[in-house]
Amino acid sequence: RPGGTAVINADDPFSGLWREMNAGRRTLTFGLDQAADVHGRAEPKALGCVLSIATPQGVVDVALRVPGRHNARNALAAAAAALAAGATLAAVSGGLTSFAGVKGRLQIRQAVGGALLIDDSYNANPDSVRAAIDVLAATPGRKILVLGDMGEIGGQAGQFHDEIGGYAKSQGLDLLLALGEHSELASRNFGAGGQHFESVDALLAALLPQLGGDTALLVKGSRFMRMERVADAVAANGATGNGVH
């Protein structure tokens, strides 16, 4: 709108186009990889990261309670938008520090047997599955991926699922337990440690004995697969818990 501020992702390959489209407006850029008005440096920690944010108002270190490099970039976007709207740096820091994630989106929960559950069951596409696998791969202990089908990805669904299986193996995951027609291709390409199941009950029967204090578990799948059935079944506090952050 006239007099508004355009908040632009400097890491976006089309950021130059966005700048051109907003010529004459005030702009505020953010980024992790490129120089920006709001620039971040992320230091991964267990189940989160420390994000150092340099802004026109100064520098602040924020302990994010959500994992993943993509969430660090999301935090920078939120910081830039808030600063553009007139928020103070202290308010931005407080807001980011207090954010504990959203149910089913890389939500950290305690699982039975003392295992760590990364509940990312709300939805899935190839990019978000890779991002979630990266989070699991950086988590200590044995690593198990429970993968449901990815939906609405067109005629290349088979290829995309196959590639996810290979990516999971390349990232050092120990087990891939698959549910759904296309996810069977992921389990096959994963190789040793990959298994496909016809039902949630069969999958749970194989999964539960694998859970222990040295285990990290990621549950991921598209909305229509209802993978929260798996996440809630293995969560120590069941479906009604808010998770552990």
What are these regions (language model features)?
Residues 1-21, 65, 151-152, 156:
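Flexible active-site lid/hinge loop adjacent to a nucleotide/diphosphate
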Residues 23-26, 36, 47, 56-61, ...:
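ATP-dependent carboxylate-amine ligase
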Residues 52-54:
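A generic structural motif
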Residues 29-33:
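Short beta-strand elements of ligand-binding domains
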Residues 43-50:
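A short, compositionally biased
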